[in-house]
């Protein structure tokens, strides 16, 4: 009897795990469709970037496509700062260059520590590739 209970428990556990994975993929697929329909929507973009990060998937294409819909002067907006701060990590990205060249403007809107930390993380990440080789 105990074996049957254990077997049923394992089967249910596996079934729930499969359903959770399917929901995760369904959620990602829906977010991708919403993003492709309107790549300028910051809310959908942030949700998609968060989901990609949670699943350990690359996000550079999404970031690049989103920022193609934004003007440089809009990089200072809250939602764009959160995308730059949390998801842009390429030292050569136009957003990082803009941040570097306009640090004082960002510091007027956001914390000096956040701005410096972002720049520091990007530059250290860039330099690490040379130490890894």
Predicted region positions:
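Classical Sec-dependent N-terminal signal peptides that target proteins to the secretory pathway
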Residues: 1-22
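Non-catalytic all-alpha helical scaffold/repeat segments
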Residues: 21, 26-133
């Amino acid at each position: 009897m105990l074996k049957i209970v254990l077997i049923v428990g394992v089967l249910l556990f596996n079934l729930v795990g499969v359903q959770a994975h399917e929901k995760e993929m369904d959620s990602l697929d829906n977010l991708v469709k919403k993003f492709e329909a309107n790549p300028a929507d910051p809310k959908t973009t942030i949700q998609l970037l968060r989901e990609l990060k949670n699943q350990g998937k690359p996000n550079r294409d999404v970031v690049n496509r989103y920022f193609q819909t934004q003007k440089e002067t809009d990089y200072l907006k809250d939602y764009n700062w959160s995308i730059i701060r949390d998801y842009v990590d390429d030292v050569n990205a136009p957003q990082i260059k803009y941040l570097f060249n306009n640090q004082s403007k960002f510091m007027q809107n956001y914390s000096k520590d956040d701005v410096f930390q972002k720049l520091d993380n990007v530059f250290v990440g860039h330099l690490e590739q040379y130490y890894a080789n």
